[in-house]
Amino acid sequence: MTKAQICIMISIVIYLVAMVMIGVVYSKKTKNVGDFYLGGRKLGPLVTAMSAEASDMSSYLLMGLPGLALVSGLAEVGWTVIGLAIGTYLNWLIVAKKLRKYSARINAITIPDYFSKRYKDNSRLIMAVAALMIIIFFVPYTASGFAACGKLFGTLFGIDYHIAMVVSAIVIVGYTSLGGFNAASMTDFIQSIIMTAALIIVLVFGVNKAGGMEQVIANANNLAGYLDVFKGYDAATNSAGSFGAIKVVSTLAWGLGYFGMPHILLRFMAIEDPNKVKISRRVAEIWVVISMAVAVLIGVVGMAMVKEGALPVFDDSETIIIQIATLLSKVGVVPALLAGIILAGILASTMSTADSQLLAASSAASENIIGGLFRIKLNETSQMIVARVTLIAISVIGVIIAWDSNSSVFGIVSFAWAGFGAVFGPVMLLSLFWKRSNRYGALAGMVVGGIMVFVWKYAIAKLGGIFDIYELLPAFICGLLVNVIVSLITPKPDDEIIEVFDELKHNK
């Protein structure tokens, strides 16, 4: 191992040990399943904001977005970022406070639990379907995080991808299963700081090695359509592509996904004071906009570095930040330690999402299927054991899915994002803003939204032309329409449900 690799390893080991220690500390504070899954609703506004956005950004912030910008310019990635920024703001503005109050009023600690109690579904069918959808889409989403860790260590140290991926999974599972929601939230808060430091260091060093910002822009301008948000760059033909109105709307639709992301919505449910949501919203939006803009710029800088010969040509564009960090590590001991911080940032972006996803998937299986659907009564100790065993079991499945070293982080995240947005987005909005929405509409909307994601991606989109759009948009619309139509043609909600809705509506 070289001196640079040793310095990088030291930084990463310190980071990983710190994450596990946080899990150990919070394991002593986790007394029941309410603490394990929702932290007792005691999350402060700053931790709520930063942990929500760190768990949101995942590995696509430091791998997916820069990689996409590098190979295709600003068109697709630019509109994606705009859609995500708008979606983030609207989610905090119209969903966060209402969901916090509603979930506390009906004593719901998971998203399936919220839907079941909101619609007074005594059959538990809504809870079961919601839990099943969470597991279906979260397991591959978590697998993408494990895959990112495997790529990181494999590229850096020549470690076998599978060994690196399994070790990373063990660390994530370790601190999450020990400390639950509070551990995940605190580590996510710390990880958001590390991710920020990583982005800044990479950008400054990259611009310097590329010959300055003027040279970066000049290189980008030499590539046809690279900086044009209505064209984009086609690397295969070395010419400008085409990014018309349909593709723009389709890509902006990424923002719709936020209304249905269980691991983000759980943070809204956990904030200590609903009146502090405004503080969280401002912090979250500022961090998201700046971090995504820097991530995209790093991709553009990476292309300039390749053109200037500062970086060799490499196959996997999603490893651009790893490539820049490796170059930095060769400058000296201190730069190598900084490179370690950068790479810990990639780990942070992955782990901050994976831990939250594991909690959501594990709660869906243990709380909502075992305890909810099958009505198996367990004491607090048994519930905690089941929660942790379920979390480990789901992680094992994630490792199996991530076993293919050629899997694309951006591709997996894109599909899972569409799934959650289409399944839970429409029903979440209607549950908060339309009192005529009932359990029949909610159930039908979730099922149709989930099915349409698969149908559109694997069948309709292949027709091309106007049908070649991001599956989230048509699936979201279908789920919304079905929910509304079915609600209108079936009996209206019980008086008790409407009373609670009106009570919260007037309780500003």
What residue spans do the PLM features occupy?
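Membrane-embedded helix-loop-helix hairpins and adjacent transmembrane boundary segments
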Residues: 1-508
